[in-house]
Amino acid sequence: MRIVALEGIDGSGVSTHSRLLHARLAGAGVKSCLWKEPTEGPVGRLIRGFLRSTEGVDSDLMALLFAADRLWGLRLGVVERCGGSPEVLVVDRYKYSSLAYQGVGSGLEWVDAVNRKAPEAEILVYIDVPTEVALRRITARERREVFETPEFLERVKSMYEEVLRLARARGVKVIRVEGVRGGVERGIEDVQGEIAERVFEALGLARA
């Protein structure tokens, strides 16, 4: 199973582009499955409750919960939902989100350690958008989550740079895609076209 993880700060379009990439892969005849974190499993439901809370969230606790939810997904959830092991698993956030988000409060080294049982992705697509753009998109939503504040997202964005360096050092193919170019937001089709082309190439597949 080849893991393709899509990452970025909240408001960067990770969920949208995960769904579209999966559709392109499936349309090309690839046995692809779309997976989202937090999952719909028992631990994932607990995490979602914390994320919607107006109270503070303990970073260490969240790191452990996300790690447990991730292993549940990899060992049980994916097989059940995907009808076996897919050729390509497109993940709407993976352990790199934990390293970036919980790494801010708990330290990158410790969060990395509790996620060692989760294999590295083959490809990590990082959708890079300025924090102010992400916040504008978040503000347009009906509901915000506990992590979606300007100060915190700035720290997460900085932490992602460390996470990307770590992933590269471990042999992960990192694909950085700009969501904004020349000060102008790129359209969804434009961004997705670049993501699909570069992912297909990295996987050794015919052009999307």
Swiss-Prot record:
Identify the InterPro entries for this entry.
Answer: P-loop_NTPase, Thymidylate_kin-like_dom, Thymidylate_kin_CS, Thymidylate_kinase
Assigned keywords, A-Z: ATP-binding, Kinase, Nucleotide biosynthesis, Nucleotide-binding, Transferase
Q: What class of enzyme is it?
A: transferase
Enzyme Commission number(s) of this protein: 2.7.4.9
List the Gene Ontology MF annotations in alphabetical order. ATP binding; dTMP kinase activity
What's one GO-annotated cellular component? cytoplasm
Q: Which domain of life is it from?
A: Archaea
Q: Does the keyword Cytoplasm apply?
A: no
BP GO annotations: dTDP biosynthetic process; dTTP biosynthetic process; dUDP biosynthetic process
Q: Name one Pfam family in it.
A: Thymidylate_kin
Fetch the SUPFAM superfamilies from UniProt.
P-loop containing nucleoside triphosphate hydrolases
Q: Which Gene3D superfamilies match?
A: P-loop containing nucleotide triphosphate hydrolases
Give the catalysed reaction(s), semicolon-separated.
Answer: dTMP + ATP = dTDP + ADP
Q: Region annotation Defective ATP-binding: residue ranges?
A: 8-15
Query: Its family?
Result: Belongs to the thymidylate kinase family.
Q: What is this protein called?
A: Putative thymidylate kinase
Q: Which organism is it from?
A: Aeropyrum pernix (strain ATCC 700893 / DSM 11879 / JCM 9820 / NBRC 100138 / K1)
Gene that produces this protein: tmk
